[in-house]
From Swiss-Prot:
It comes from Saccharomyces cerevisiae (strain ATCC 204508 / S288c). The conserved ExDxxE motif might be important for catalytic activity. Residues 172-189 have a biased composition (Polar residues). GO terms for biological process: cell wall organization. It catalyses: Hydrolysis of (1->3)-beta-D-glucosidic linkages in (1->3)-beta-D-glucans. Keywords: Cell wall, Cell wall biogenesis/degradation, Glycoprotein, Glycosidase, Hydrolase, Secreted, Signal. Disruption phenotype: Leads to a slight sensitivity to the cell wall damaging agent calcofluor white. Also shows a slightly decreased ability to grow at 39 degrees Celsius. Results in an increased resistance to Quantazyme, a recombinant beta-1,3-glucanase that hydrolyzes beta-1,3-glucan. Residues 1-23 form the signal peptide. Probable circularly permuted 1,3-beta-glucanase involved in cell wall modification through beta-1,3-glucan network alterations such as increased branching or remodeling. It is found in: Secreted; Secreted, Cell wall. Residues 190-219 have a biased composition (Low complexity). Glycans are attached at N236, N417. The gene is TOS1. This is Probable circularly permuted 1,3-beta-glucanase TOS1.
Length: 455
């Protein structure tokens, strides 16, 4: 049913469209794109609220139960443990996580006068056009009907028949998004068939700040590297995918499909034990994820509830942390995958993949706001524009974009700064050594860029 819009809402929507036009933004593939950037700064990140935490997944009834989880803190819910997710086509050359040694001065030195550039210098551009999300994947359910034996490298030694059922894409709850590019924004949410105007979303989400699942090493330096990966070698990183029940780790059921599992070195197959990702390029539509190297203590223990039978590991926790990446996203136009030539890197509340990343929304805390942060995402096939967006109770992002590294690589740092409630996504040139000096981090924090001010 069509709803009558107030004059205020109409004026606000008209102003948003005019701002986008004035900023020389372009409309392509259902999304607006404004200016290329080398830094995005999220501000006012964090809220105190409640989301629905999964407390049980019943294999007999195929039903999940949830309970209120109420918490707060600077950057919530992103001060909770996070898992790091990748979708092809992508080649990951480096990944790391840093934590401060004691109290980091760099997180306190940010000037309130930092210059923020938007689509047009000196002007705030407010956009309410829908961020077209492309996270859903066609899920292949693989039911294991006999034992599969693997060696220490995850290679199959003997294998009997399996029954593979390929069905339609399992719908996730990624159906509505709002995009914010200024502190004065009010949300306009759109669905596939209609648009409606509203004030900032009130979907509850929050999380308690959790300590790092991997302690900082006791070395000289202001930030210590707690996790690190280069192809074929990894420290305190566990690579996983959604091939549970196919190769000796994780589970499959007719209720919930494949769980997470250890990933083989190709990133695509399952494995019986943890392996480092090899020197590979992951093709379109395939996904893998990284957890820390620390196992959960047990179900309903230090990781909360998780699906029975999975390899359960901690994510990367703490309100102050730095993720670093070096990656390439080459073109991949030869296939017909659901997300063909649409690479992405994003963060999830680690509770989500430990229960159900894709499928019944009641089996995940995602819909109720426990947190997703898209760091670098292509929204339309073949695009060279990587956007960023936050999905939680605040929902926001920017129409500015990073250039996709189809040739060569992109090095980036993502800094979580609890002292002023900001998250910085920044292109960098520095090497990712065992320690980062406070001066380097301060330089990163001082870098101006595109504003993504949350309501």
């Amino acid at each position: 049913m069509l709803q009558k819009l107030s004059m205020t809402a109409l004026v606000g929507l008209f102003s948003s469209v005019v701002s986008l036009v004035n900023a020389d933004c372009t409309y392509s593939g259902g999304n607006y794109y404004c200016a290329q950037t080398d830094a995005i700064i999220y501000s006012n990140v964090g809220l105190s609220a409640t989301y629905q935490d999964v407390t049980n997944m019943d294999e007999s009834s195929c039903a999940c139960t949830q309970a209120d989880f109420t918490a707060s803190g600077s950057l919530a819910p992103f001060n909770e443990e996070l898992s790091v997710h990748f979708r092809g086509p992508i080649e990951l050359l480096q990944f790391g996580v840093y934590y401060p040694n004691g109290e980091s001065n760099a997180l306190k030195k940010r000037s309130e006068k930092q210059s923020i550039e938007s689509c047009k210098e000196g002007e705030a551009v407010v956009s309410r056009h829908k961020h077209q999300h492309k996270r859903d994947v066609a899920v292949e359910y693989v039911q294991v009907t006999s034992t599969v034996y693997v060696d220490s490298n995850g290679q199959t030694v003997t294998a009997d028949s399996t029954n593979t059922v390929v069905g339609p894409a399992v719908p996730s709850s990624y159906t509505k998004d709002s995009t914010v590019l200024s502190s004065s924004a009010q949300a306009v949410e759109t669905s596939e068939s209609q648009s409606s105007i509203s004030s900032s979303k009130t979907t509850s989400s929050a999380a308690a700040a959790s300590s790092s699942s991997s302690s900082s090493s006791n070395t000289n330096g202001d930030w210590s590297r707690g996790s690190y990966f280069v192809p074929g070698s990894t420290s305190n990183c566990t690579f996983m995918n959604n091939q549970g029940g196919t190769a000796g780790s994780g589970v499959w059921s007719s209720c919930f499909g494949n769980s997470i599992s250890f990933a083989a070195s190709d990133g695509v197959s399952g494995a019986a034990s943890a392996q480092a990702l090899g020197d590979v390029t992951i093709k379109s539509g395939n996904e893998f994820m990284i957890f820390s190297g620390e196992e959960c203590s047990g179900n309903n223990g230090d990781c909360g509830y998780y699906r029975e039978g999975i390899p359960a590991y901690h994510g990367f926790g703490g309100a102050d942390k730095i993720f670093v990446f070096e990656f390439s996203m080459p073109s991949d136009t030869s296939g017909s995958a659901y997300n063909q030539d649409m690479p992405a890197i994003w963060l999830l509340n680690a509770k989500i993949p430990r229960t159900l990343q894709y499928g019944d929304a009641s089996c995940s805390c995602w819909k109720t706001g426990c947190g997703e942060m898209d760091l670098f995402e292509i929204l339309t096939a073949g695009s060279d524009k990587l956007i960023s967006h936050i999905h939680d109770g605040q929902d926001g992002g920017t129409q500015d974009y990073f250039e996709r590294p189809t040739d060569g690589t992109l090095k980036a740092a993502v800094i979580f700064n609890s002292s002023d409630k900001t998250i910085h996504i920044i292109e960098v040139d520095e090497s990712f050594d065992a320690t980062l000096s406070d001066d380097v981090v301060d330089q990163w924090l001082s870098k101006s860029g595109s504003s993504a001010a949350l309501p």
